[in-house]
A protein has these predicted regions:
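Phosphate/pyrophosphate-binding catalytic cores of soluble transferases and nucleic-acid-acting enzymes
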Residues: 1-193
Length: 195
């Protein structure tokens, strides 16, 4: 197996031993670890996210841990862009990238690609969330269906996160979130390991 072109993805629930496994694998194959957990990117969430402690890094280079403030907007698209750069950098040094985490959207982004929806300003997104809170989930879903009728076929009224996202994307871009979706695939040689 040509490890220079391979990327390992280690995923599973919080505190399942992913980090320890990744460190052992990295030592064995000359790898470097890249964070793939949405909570572990934030400086302020060390304890809540079961982030590996510096001592446990054991001379294995770790990337994208605790570098962003929770006060800053950080999307899965932002993460994917940084990860692609890290992968190139790691490979230039003849090492093997090992992505570790539990965030499904991050793994979906690396395995399937992401839709290139423009960044929506935080102020705009905050107003949408306030509207949702003010009028309630049921009424908000009705408003979404009026704004974007096709959405009722793809999102459940009880899935607050997706309902709000579909609404804000339609309102901001004038296109349905479902129009943005494209069939994309990863160009990487991936090995998935579930812990």
């Amino acid at each position: 197996m040509d490890l220079k072109s391979k990327i390992f993805l280690i995923y599973g629930p919080t505190a399942s031993g992913k980090s320890n496994f990744a460190i052992k694998l990295a030592k064995k194959i000359k790898g470097e670890i890249i964070n793939a957990d949405s909570m572990q990117v934030y400086k302020e969430l060390k304890i809540l996210s079961a982030r590996p402690i510096l001592k446990s890094y054991k001379n294995i280079k770790h990337h994208l841990y605790g570098f962003k403030s929770v006060k800053k907007n950080f999307s899965s698209g932002d993460w994917l862009s940084l990860v692609n750069k890290k992968i190139l950098d790691i490979r230039k040094r003849n090492k093997t990238p090992i992505l570790v985490g539990g965030t499904g959207l991050y793994f979906k982004a690396i395995t399937e690609g992401l839709v290139n929806i423009p960044n929506i300003p935080i102020r705009f997104r905050s107003k949408i969330r306030l509207l949702h809170k003010k009028i309630g989930a049921k009424k908000f879903f009705s408003e979404l269906v009026k704004l974007d009728p096709v959405s009722k076929n793809f999102v459940k009224p009880t899935d607050t996160q997706r309902v709000i996202r579909a609404y804000e994307v339609k309102l901001f871009t004038k296109r349905s979130i479902y129009d943005w979706f494209k069939s994309t695939r990863s160009n990487y040689d991936l090995s998935l390991i579930h812990i």
